[in-house]
């Protein structure tokens, strides 16, 4: 069974750094969808093939989100990938607050502002959670808390938006090869531990997350809402 959906309007928030958001946007564009991406940077590291537009967007800026939303009367798929992590100092209150502001509050505000456009189509929202939605880590307490919040937010919004035929789901990646994980991959001990604990014996790739995203956005997932799919190569079951 091949998942293929064409001609839909997609917005992928947080797709400027050649990571998960970029892979999802690329997959959506390859299937003939109209895709717009955003990122915190002025320009993306590279523009995914087939993607129509890039907009710089700070998701802690309400006015900027509202300005972007004026471009959409209707939106079929919203993907929320924007997130930050501050591994060295997340225990500091101001840093903790900033991570929560971006990863949880910012993504929630994006959903709120684009809600009307998604209701217009009976659309699909895909949030990017994390295996840290379920696993603890002393080094990223703010990141883990924010991603646990995304998991619960997904469930709550799924209940709220179901009467409008809008589905809300999340994907919880494990260790994936991205710019954000570059430091960890360069640490030989950490890299070995990740590979040893992962039953598939490797780090995930952004494309490993794009496949489930395409499924959740498709009509084949029409009866799925409020779910968080863990995509971690089995890391969390070890």
Q: What is each PLM-predicted segment?
A:
Residues 130:
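Residue(s) in the substrate-gating loop at a strand-loop-helix junction
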Residues 92-109, 126, 150, 200:
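Catalytic Tyr-X3-Lys loop
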Residues 2-36:
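Canonical Rossmann dinucleotide-binding motif of NAD(H)/NADP(H)-dependent dehydrogenases/reductases
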Residues 102-120, 158-159, 163, 218:
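Amphipathic alpha-helical dimer-interface segment in Rossmann-like NAD(P)H-dependent oxidoreductases
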Residues 162-167, 224-226:
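Short, small/polar-rich loop/turn modules that mediate ligand/substrate recognition or access, typified
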Residues 83-98, 116, 139-142, 182-186:
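Conserved mid-core segment of classical short-chain dehydrogenase/reductases
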Residues 111, 146, 154:
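Active-site helix of classical SDR
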Residues 19, 135, 213-214, 225-238:
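Short C-terminal tail/terminal secondary-structure segment
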């Amino acid at each position: 069974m091949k998942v293929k959906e064409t001609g839909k309007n997609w917005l992928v928030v947080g797709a400027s750094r050649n990571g998960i958001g970029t892979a999802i946007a690329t997959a959506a564009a390859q299937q003939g969808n109209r895709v717009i991406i955003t990122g915190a940077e002025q320009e993306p590291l590279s523009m995914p093939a087939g993607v129509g537009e890039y907009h710089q967007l700070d998701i802690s800026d309400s006015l900027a989100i509202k300005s972007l939303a004026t471009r959409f009367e209707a939106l079929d798929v919203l993907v929320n990938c924007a997130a930050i992590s501050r591994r060295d100092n997340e225990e500091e209150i101001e840093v903790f607050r900033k991570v929560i502001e971006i990863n949880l509050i910012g993504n929630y505000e994006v959903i709120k502002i684009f809600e009307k456009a998604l209701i217009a189509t009976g659309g699909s929202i895909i949030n990017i959670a994390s295996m840290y939605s379920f696993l603890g880590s002393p080094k990223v307490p703010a990141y883990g808390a924010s991603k646990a919040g995304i998991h619960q937010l997904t469930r709550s919004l799924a209940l709220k938006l179901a009467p409008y035929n809008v589905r809300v789901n999340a994907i919880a990646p494990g260790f994936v090869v991205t710019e954000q994980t570059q430091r960890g991959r360069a640490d030989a001990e950490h890299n070995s531990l990740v590979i040893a604990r992962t039953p598939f014996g490797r780090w995930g790739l952004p494309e490993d997350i794009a496949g489930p995203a395409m499924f959740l956005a498709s009509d084949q997932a029409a009866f799925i809402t409020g779910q968080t799919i863990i995509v971690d190569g089995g890391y969390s079951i070890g």
